[in-house]
C-alpha cells in the first residue's frame, strides 16, 4: 500500500491572546488563536539556561471555534491536534503573501488543559463544558484522554449545571496543606 504522507500536528501550549471568533456567511464559526510553545535547555559551553518560544497560528472551525471563543482566554493551556496548511493571500499593496497555520476541523482535536481561570463558576451563570457535569470529572469514570475534550468539530455541553448534591464518595479530599511538587 503506497502512502500519500501524513500531515498531523500536535501542540501543547498557552494562548497569547483571547481567541478571535468570526462567522462565515453560511453561519459556521471560525476562531483564530495564537499558541506559544516553549523549550528550554542548558548551554553546554556557558552552562547558562536558555529558552526559546515558538508562536503558532491555529485556526479552529465549527463547534470547536465556538467552544474556543467561549471558554479559552489569554494564558489558557490547550492541547491541539490538526493539520499544517499554507495559504496564499494578497496584502493591501497587491503583494502575494503566504501564511502557514495549524488547521483544526472535523478530524482535529482541541482539549483544554489546566484548571479554570479564576476558580469557581464561570461569569454569567453559564455552565462550562465538563465531563458529564461533574466538576473536573470527579465522581465519574475517567475518559481515555481526560476531560474537556472536543473532537471532530463536535462539542457537547451539559444541559444543566452540575447537581448540588455531592456524588458518592469519589471526590478527592480537599487537603490544601500538601506541598505541590511543581
Curated annotation (Swiss-Prot):
Annotated GO CC locations: nucleoid
UniProt entry keywords in alphabetical sequence: DNA damage, DNA recombination, DNA repair, DNA replication, DNA-binding
Motif mapping: Important for interaction with partner proteins: 177-182
An annotated GO BP: DNA replication
Domain SSB: 6-111
Presence of keyword Zinc-finger: no
DNA-binding region coordinates: 55-61
Ranges of biased composition (kind: Gly residues): 115-139
Entry's Gene Ontology molecular function annotations: enzyme activator activity; single-stranded DNA binding
InterPro entries: NA-bd_OB-fold (IPR012340), Primosome_PriB/ssb (IPR000424), ssDNA-bd (IPR011344)
Region Disordered, annotated ranges: 113-182
Low complexity compositional bias, start-end: 140-159
Keyword DNA-binding applies: yes
Gene3D superfamilies in alphabetical order: Nucleic acid-binding proteins
Function according to Swiss-Prot or TrEMBL: Plays an important role in DNA replication, recombination and repair. Binds to ssDNA and to an array of partner proteins to recruit them to their sites of action during DNA metabolism.
Subunit structure: Homotetramer.
Record-given protein name: Single-stranded DNA-binding protein
